[in-house]
Amino acid sequence: MDAEMAAPALAAAHLLDSPMRPQVSRYYSKKRGSSHSRNGKDDANHDESKNQSPGLPLSRQSLSSSATHTYHTGGFYEIDHEKLPPKSPIHLKSIRVVKVSGYTSLDVTVSFPSLLALRSFFSSSPRSCTGPELDERFVMSSNHAARILRRRVAEEELAGDVMHQDSFWLVKPCLYDFSASSPHDVLTPSPPPATAQAKAPAASSCLLDTLKCDGAGWGVRRRVRYIGRHHDASKEASAASLDGYNTEVSVQEEQQQRLRLRLRLRQRREQEDNKSTSNGKRKREEAESSMDKSRAARKKKAKTYKSPKKVEKRRVVEAKDGDPRRGKDRWSAERYAAAERSLLDIMRSHGACFGAPVMRQALREEARKHIGDTGLLDHLLKHMAGRVPEGSADRFRRRHNADGAMEYWLEPAELAEVRRLAGVSDPYWVPPPGWKPGDDVSAVAGDLLVKKKVEELAEEVDGVKRHIEQLSSNLVQLEKETKSEAERSYSSRKEKYQKLMKANEKLEKQVLSMKDMYEHLVQKKGKLKKEVLSLKDKYKLVLEKNDKLEEQMASLSSSFLSLKEQLLLPRNGDNLNMERERVEVTLGKQEGLVPGEPLYVDGGDRISQQADATVVQVGEKRTARKSSFRICKPQGTFMWPHMASGTSMAISGGGSSSCPVASGPEQLPRSSSCPSIGPGGLPPSSRAPAEVVVASPLDEHVAFRGGFNTPPSASSTNAAAAAKLPPLPSPTSPLQTRALFAAGFTVPALHNFSGLTLRHVDSSSPSSAPCGAREKMVTLFDGDCRGISVVGTELALATPSYC
C-alpha cells in the first residue's frame, strides 16, 4: 500500500508564514478491495487515490463483527501504533494520545496536534492551559478504532501540568528538539542521497528531519511492502520492516529467477528435441544466454538509480471451513460478517422458521436497506445456505417451494448433527414433537407416534369437555341461587324503599305545615311590629301628657304653698301661745290617768295602749290629753271632712284604726276620714286622698327657704313632740275658719288627676319616735268632703296611674 503525506515542504512553509489559521486536515482510513485484471496486475488508479469523502455507503465502509464500542466525546485515548493502518498520517506515528471529537456507528473521528502546533505551543512562554491546538483530524472506521484506541486516559492523569509535558503528547520526545527548531529549518530541505551505500542513513536522517519539520521535504512517493495480517511474514522481512516500512525493495532478483527458469526450460526442450543440433547452434544459444545475462545486469544497474516500478501485489484471504467465497477475496471478511449479521437480524424480525419461511424477494428488499452492495447481497443469498453466522446459534436454510420460488428460513445449528446421529438422509427433516434421540425415524414410526399423540389429545379433549359440562352445571346452579338471592334482596329493598317513600311524604307534610306556620308567624310578626309601633306612639303621647301633668302639679304645689303662707304666717305668735297652754293642760290631766289601761273614745272604739305613751282625747270642752299610743306609720292619710259633719274626725294610727272624736272649738284633729260626700262636694274624678305632714312654724320657714325636702319615709310624733305642737283652730272656730271663708277665700279648682300627696317633714330637730320623724298638722279644705283636713307644708307628687 502507498503512504501519502499531507502536503509538500513548500506548502508547509506557506502555512507557517501565512497569517491566516490553517484549516484542519482530515485523513480517512479505508481498505481498498484489490481488483485483479486478467493479466494479474493491480489497477494503478487505486494507488493514486488520496483522501476519500466520509459519506460512503455502508457496503463501502470497513465493518467489523465485534460489538459497537462506546466512546466519550472529548476524552483522550492512548493509541496502539502497531494497529495503525498503513494509510494513517505520518504525524500520528509519533503522537501518543488523541482526542475523540465525534463518533457514529460506522466511524470515529479523532483530533491530535501537528508537530507545528506542538512546536508553537512549547516555544511560547505563557503556555495555554488547555494544551496545544488540535489542528489535525483522522477519521477511522469503528473496527479500526476498537483496535487502535487502546484505553481512555483518566481525568486524574490530566490534572496538573501533565498536558504541558512533551512526554504526554509524543511517543519518543527525545527525537524532537522543539527549542532549537526554527522556521528556517522548515524551509531547508534535506539533501538527496548520493550513493546507494548511503541510502539507509540518509533515509533515517530524512525521516527525522521530516518529523521535525512537520512533513517538509516529503513530495516524492515511495513504494513500500505491506504484509497482510493473514500471512506470516518471514524473519528477514520482519527484521527489515519493523515499523511496516521498507525503503529499499529490489525487483531484480525476481526477474533474474524468472529468466533463469526460462533459460533452463529452453535448454531442456532443446536438449530433448534437438539432441543432434550443431555446435554452431549451441554457440548461438550460449551467446543469447550471455546476452540475456548482460542485458539483465545492465537493467539491474540502471534500475538501481531509477525509481522501482510497482510491485505486483495480491491479497490472499484465508478461507474458513464452509466459506462461500471459496478462497476468493472480492469482499473482506468484515463485510461478509456484517452482511450475514444483517440478514440474520432481518430473518429473525420476520420470524422465518421451518414452516413459515420468508420469500427471496421480500428478504432482498429488506436487506437492501442495510447492505448497499447488491453484488455482495446476491452472493450471500446464493451461497449462505447451510452457514452458521459467527456468534449465532441459527443456520441459514433455503430451498425452492412447490411454485418454484426461493424461500429462506432459520433452523437450530445443532439440527444437522441430530440428523446425522439419527441417520436421516433428508436435509430438511425436522424431528417430530416428542421425538428423542434413539427413537425410530421411519414413516411408520412417525405415524404410530402421531396416532399416539392424537389419542392422548382426544383423551385430554374428553376431560376438558367433562370439565366444561361440570362447570356449566355449576353455573346453572349458581344462577338459580343468585336469582333467588337477588329476588329476596329486591323485595327487601323494595319494602325499605316504600318505607322511605312514606317517611319522605310525612316529612314533606311536616315541611309544608312548618312552612304554613312560618308564614303565619311572619304575619303575626308583622302585626306585632305594627302594634309595637302603635304602642310606641302611645308611649310618646303618655310621656307628653306626663310632662303636662308635672307642670300642672308644679303649679298646684305653688298654689298650695302660697295658701299655706297666707294661713300660717299671720298667726305664728298666737299659735305659739296657744300651743304652750294646751301642752300644760294636757300634762296636768295625764297625771291622774292610770297607765296600762286601755282608753276609749266617745264612740266606743278601742285604742291600743302603749307602755310609754298617752292618749289625747278631745271632748267638747276642748281639753288636750296626753296620747298613750305611738304612730308607727311613716305618714298619715287625711281626707277633707264634710262641712256638715261638724268637728267629728277619724284618727288613723299606726294600726290603721279610726275612732270618731267630738271636736270642739278648741280641739286639734289628728286624722280624719270621710267616706261619704255631701251634696256640695267635688266631682268624683277629683276625689283623691291627700297626705299632709305639717312641721313647726320655725321648721317650715327653714324648709321653705332651703327648698322642699322629700324624705324616703315620714316620721311619727312621740309624746314630747306632740306636747310642743301648737293647737290649731277648728274648722268651726269663729276665730280662724270663719274669718277665712268670710274674707272670700276660695279653693282653686282641682284638675282631674290622682295620687296627690302633700308632705312636710320637720328635719330641724331629731325625733325620738320609732319612725324617726316629728309631724305637725294643719287643717285645709278637703275638696271631696267639703271640709277642712290637716295639711302639711310639703306637697309630694306621686306618679299618676292611668287606666
Curated annotation (Swiss-Prot):
Alphabetical UniProt keywords: Cell cycle, Cell division, Chromosome, Chromosome partition, Coiled coil, Meiosis, Nucleus
Domain of life where this protein originates: Eukaryota
Bias type Basic residues, positions: 296-313
Keyword Coiled coil: yes
Region (Disordered): 21-64, 264-333, 651-688
Protein's job: Plays a fundamental role in building the proper chromosome structure at the beginning of meiosis in male meiocytes. Required for the transition from leptotene to zygotene in meiocytes. Required for homologous chromosome pairing.
Organism classification: Eukaryota, Viridiplantae, Streptophyta, Embryophyta, Tracheophyta
InterPro entries assigned to the protein according to its UniProt record, in alphabetical order: DYAD/AMEIOTIC1
Gene Ontology, cellular component aspect: chromosome; nucleus
Biased composition (Basic and acidic residues): 39-50, 283-295, 314-333
Statement: the UniProt record of this protein carries the keyword Transport: no
Coiled-coil intervals: 450-567
UniProt protein name: Protein AMEIOTIC 1 homolog
